[in-house]
């Protein structure tokens, strides 16, 4: 895991990472030692820019004089966010996932990204992404579907995920469109 430390005025230069996904916005502030100082995760409500702006203003207001060494964007809205906030770097999300996975597990050979609207799998061979698999059936099994179903069943999505992870038997919901998955669950 990544160490978390107090976000103080004397933390030195920081790096800000923004992941603007199809359904959520994630923002992290880390120090020069890659220790987490601040995180934010929220639904983007179809319009990520005001939410990101609000978070950045909050950070600058709470930490005047903060020295920002770099701001990097990734995700579905990478270019939009990069241009809107004049960020230093934009990083394709597959590369961002691979870089993060290697940090925690240098010999990683497979990565799964379950996003809000799609699901991607990356095969890693000889230290590089060798193949990418993308689900081709609308948003089956993705974040927005799972979140909607968790709410419909009266669960917080984190609790719902934990229940699924530790279930005695997996449930076959099919592998097609969420409309068909909805029918499978209701049966």
Describe the function of each predicted region.
Residues 1-7, 89-95:
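Charged, flexible boundary elements
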Residues 5-33, 108-125:
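Gly/Thr-rich phosphate-binding beta-strand-loop-beta motif of the actin/hexokinase/Hsp70
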Residues 18-58, 136:
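Short glycine-rich, Thr/Ser-proximal phosphate-binding strand/loop in the N-terminal lobe
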Residues 28-31, 80-86, 120-127, 133-135, ...:
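Short acidic, glycine/serine/threonine-rich loops at helix termini
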Residues 44, 60-94, 123, 130-131, ...:
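Short beta-strand-loop/turn "lid" adjacent to the catalytic site in phosphate-handling enzymes
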Residues 44-49, 126-169, 182:
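Glycine-rich phosphate-binding loop plus the immediately following alpha-helix
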Residues 171-187:
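A contiguous, well-structured pocket-lining segment that forms one wall/lid of small-molecule binding clefts
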């Amino acid at each position: 895991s990544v160490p978390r430390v107090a976000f103080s005025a004397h933390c030195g230069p920081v790096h800000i990472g923004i992941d603007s996904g199809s359904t959520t916005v994630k923002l992290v502030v880390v120090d020069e030692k890659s220790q987490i100082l601040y995180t934010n995760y929220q639904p983007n409500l179809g319009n990520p820019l005001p939410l990101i702006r609000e978070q950045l203003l909050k950070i600058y207001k709470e930490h005047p004089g903060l020295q920002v060494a770099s701001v990097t964007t990734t995700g579905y809205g990478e270019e939009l966010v990069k241009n809107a906030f004049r960020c230093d770097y934009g990083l394709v999300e597959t590369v961002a996932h691979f870089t993060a996975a290697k940090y925690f597990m240098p010999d990683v050979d497979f990565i799964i990204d379950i996003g809000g609207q799609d699901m991607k799998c990356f095969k890693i061979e000889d230290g590089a992404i060798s193949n990418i698999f993308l689900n081709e059936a609308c948003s089956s099994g993705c974040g927005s579907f799972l979140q909607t179903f968790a709410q419909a069943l009266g669960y917080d999505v984190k609790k719902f995920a934990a229940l699924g992870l530790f279930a005695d038997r997996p449930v076959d919901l099919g592998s097609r469109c969420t409309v068909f998955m909805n029918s499978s669950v209701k049966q």
